[in-house]
């Protein structure tokens, strides 16, 4: 059975394909295979609303089962920023490095580790052409470093250290990150549903 990932993000595609290896009956596609499709504008006020909107829109317009992800970094002491604007925190065309620099700038007065707590949040929405079927959430808690460390990962990974770990998400092996990430936690809550999903 085919499931379309509503993303063109190569990092996310690779991560999801790795997690889906346990489900031999599923074939994972991405929006790279549907270049004419136009994603809806993200107008939700939280990750859940955006994930559902992306999943339902693609499922309806492409007449397929669709799995959509909306995720980002939340810093409570910054009133939840960057939050749903994680990918475009420093501007619509901002690079990962520019987004990280803006985050560090906004956190420059937060010296104590307890003031630098943060968490990654992921919401996954699974939709069929007839509508939403399942929506789940995963969270990974940690804190923000004073400077970037590591070369793996993407986004804010080089600034984020998971609680009980010493290395940033960009310093640990990708396979390890994929076992402990917010996306993995959300995916595990979807696993039973995917296991029973058939054409």
Swiss-Prot record:
Enzyme class: hydrolase
Cellular component terms per the entry's GO annotation: cytosol
Active site: 70 (proton acceptor)
Catalytic activity reported: XTP + H2O = XMP + diphosphate + H(+); dITP + H2O = dIMP + diphosphate + H(+); ITP + H2O = IMP + diphosphate + H(+)
UniProt-listed Enzyme Commission number(s): 3.6.1.66
Cofactor: Mg(2+)
An example Gene Ontology biological process: nucleotide metabolic process
InterPro entries hit by this protein: dITP/XTP_pyrophosphatase, ITPase-like_fam, RdgB/HAM1
Domain of life: Bacteria
Matching SUPFAM superfamilies: ITPase-like
Cofactor: binding comment: Binds 1 Mg(2+) ion per subunit.
Residues annotated for substrate binding in this entry: 7-12, 71, 154-157, 177, 182-183
Keywords noted in UniProt: Hydrolase, Magnesium, Metal-binding, Nucleotide metabolism, Nucleotide-binding
Binding site for Mg(2+): 41, 70
GO molecular function: dITP diphosphatase activity; ITP diphosphatase activity; metal ion binding; nucleotide binding; ribonucleoside triphosphate phosphatase activity; XTP diphosphatase activity
Function: Pyrophosphatase that catalyzes the hydrolysis of nucleoside triphosphates to their monophosphate derivatives, with a high preference for the non-canonical purine nucleotides XTP (xanthosine triphosphate), dITP (deoxyinosine triphosphate) and ITP. Seems to function as a house-cleaning enzyme that removes non-canonical purine nucleotides from the nucleotide pool, thus preventing their incorporation into DNA/RNA and avoiding chromosomal lesions.
Family note: Belongs to the HAM1 NTPase family.
Subunit and partners: Homodimer.
NCBIfam families on file: RdgB/HAM1 family non-canonical purine NTP pyrophosphatase
Record HAMAP family: Non_canon_purine_NTPase
Entry protein name: dITP/XTP pyrophosphatase
Originating species: Protochlamydia amoebophila (strain UWE25)
